[in-house]
Amino acid sequence: MNQKIIYSSALLVGLGSPQAFAHTEKAHTPQKPNIIFIMCDDMGYGDLGCYGQPYISTPNIDNMAREGMRFTQAYAGSPVSAPSRASLMTGQHTGHCEVRGNKEYWTQASTVMYGDNKEFSVVGQHPYDPEHVILPEIMKDNGYTTGMFGKWAGGYEGSASTPDKRGIDEYYGYICQFQAHLYYPNFLNRYSPSLGDTGVVRVVMEENIKYPMYGPDYHKRTQYSADLIHQKAMEWIEKQDGEQPFFGIFTYTLPHAELVQPEDSILNHYKTQFADDKAFGGQKGSRYNAITHVHAQFAGMITRLDYYVGEVLKKLEEKGFDENTIVIFTSDNGPHEEGGADPTFFGRDGKLRGLKRQCYE
């Protein structure tokens, strides 16, 4: 892969081709670069090997840092999710942005049933101002096809600010970031005109709702949202034919709590590495179940994310897009200590101060 990588530090990292703005089909007619923007959730500066993390393996992201450019003076717009993402999408300072916090919107009924599971009827967060243009709308107006896969957090179901109404051609993930606290959710959201969708719909996870949301049987659920979202992102890249530039926003929820993932080789590797590990007893009133192997779960989620990044880069190369694609990797804010997470063990935020929800620097 002969490409220059634009890799950033604490909060913004990326990869792109040296040909991105130079390759031409006709003289003096620059070809627009494809852009993939990857935003993970609650990852700190010090959680990657390229920034000194000694315990967690992140070879694909480390390679991006080694080959590319790091933005070491780049900062998130806010130390918490929704306003940070709003700053990115609107280009506004949080003092001017419509979204000031993780405000949640509910339906009139406080709960909804999925199988035997009583679920909170939270449907989303405060919407982006419909009078203010946002990033995917700008890209679409400039000839790009757009796709978003992961957390939205820029409106609630039925509002004027859902992906289908804000410049996104294809979407799969969580409209509501509160729902994203479950990695084995009762439902995900989708907008896919090719499947007949005329707006955002709910896709019920039929296998998951056979088992309860809380207690030991929760871990019998099999539909893991992070893997499903990544699969849809990969399918979207595969569908691109090079006739139109594409802009993808991959807002993976890893490594946000809850700390849980499939029992596969990634997790089992870290269970061996952290043989003397901690447990988390659950949190009353939250969505976080009791878990064992806290350090292994957290480390495994980051390595899993790194694997996703590697698959994205490989797919771009297979499709012949690597010479004209800019890939940016970033986090929405600093590391968290929710659901049993232990940022002190992993070095907190590297050389930076504070954690999620704290304003420093």
State each model region's role.
Residues 27-33, 40-55, 72, 100-104, ...:
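Active-site-proximal cap/lid insertion segments
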Residues 34, 60, 134, 163, ...:
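Amphipathic alpha-helical recognition patches that constitute DNA-binding helices
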Residues 142-156:
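Short, well-structured beta-strand/strand-turn elements
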